A protein has these predicted regions:
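N-terminal positive-inside, membrane-proximal cytosolic segments immediately preceding the first
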Residues: 1-13, 17-19
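Ser/Thr/Pro- and often Gln-rich low-complexity regulatory segments
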Residues: 4, 23-24, 185, 206-214
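Charged, alpha-helix-enriched surfaces in structured cytosolic catalytic cores
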Residues: 9, 186, 190, 236
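Juxtamembrane extramembrane loops of integral membrane proteins
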Residues: 22-192, 199
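Coiled-coil termination/hinge junctions
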Residues: 200-243
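Short solvent-exposed strand-capping/beta-turn motif centered on an Asx-Ser/Thr pair
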Residues: 244-248
């Protein structure tokens, strides 16, 4: 539903509809995207905690996969925070250094996004595209299932919006040139939401590789459990023999 709303507003922007209603709509979509990303981040954190717990129990089996999970989170958090800083710079460019990210004042500002993202001194949009593509490639390597890998790669999309061959603009200019501040911020938040989705898919794939959440055993061991820790001379020794199921990998 969120992505559908986003596409509708993007289509309206393509028709140069920058009415206050449309820009306010972008704010609503942006808020929903932020909430969705926060929910996904919490879910991803729990998955990594499960990997960490499994690693404590069986570091030989899980250790390598847990390290991959930590790396997934590290790369995801770094890119998420990089985009967050870009959003703050755009908002402050439009609303001033004391801008409130939850209460955008100059939503219709057409210069802020271009000045930050398309500066001739160093295009942040070009840097962002490279980082998104590098992240997409790194996360794809973490996923074994071909279908899920394809979904993951589609989630981080850096193709130029519009039909192939009909749009002569670059990805950078298509997304940020003369784009109202509210729209640019929403676009960046969408990528943050996509990052949390991709992070979740990568972590889930890693968790499946080590059967996190399953209790699997491959060995039965007999153990003697004495009824008393103290045995007096001449008294009978009593103990129970129990069978324990363990994972010896």
């Amino acid at each position: 539903m969120i992505n559908l709303m986003y596409l509708v507003f993007i289509a309206m922007m393509a028709m140069n509809d920058t009415s206050s209603e449309v820009l306010s709509g972008f704010e609503l979509v942006e808020k929903s995207l932020r909430e969705s990303a926060a929910t996904a981040a919490d879910r991803n954190r729990k998955t990594l905690e499960e990997l960490e717990a499994a690693n404590r129990v069986n570091p030989t089996k899980v250790g390598e996969w847990y390290k991959k999970g930590v790396e997934v989170k590290k790369q995801s958090d770094e890119l998420f925070e990089y985009i967050q800083q870009l959003k703050l710079r755009i908002i402050r460019q439009a609303d001033g250094k004391d801008a409130n990210v939850d209460q955008l004042q100059h939503k219709e500002d057409l210069d802020a996004a271009s000045e930050i993202m398309l500066s001739p001194m160093g295009s942040e949009a070009a840097k962002l595209k490279k980082r998104l593509e590098a992240y997409r490639a790194a996360m794809s390597r973490m996923v074994d299932d071909p279908e899920k890998r394809a979904m993951l790669e589609r989630a981080i999309d850096t193709k130029v919006p519009g039909k192939s061959g009909l749009n002569l603009r670059s990805w950078e200019t298509a997304l940020f040139e003369n784009m109202p501040m509210a729209s640019a911020v929403t676009i960046l938040t969408k990528y943050q939401n996509d990052i949390r989705y991709v992070e979740g898919e990568a972590l889930a794939s890693i968790a499946r590789s080590v059967d996190v959440g399953d209790y699997r055993v491959n060995k039965i061991v007999a153990q003697v459990v004495p009824k008393s820790q103290i045995v007096m001379s001449g008294t009978p020794y009593e103990a129970a023999i129990v069978l324990s199921a363990i994972d010896s990998t």
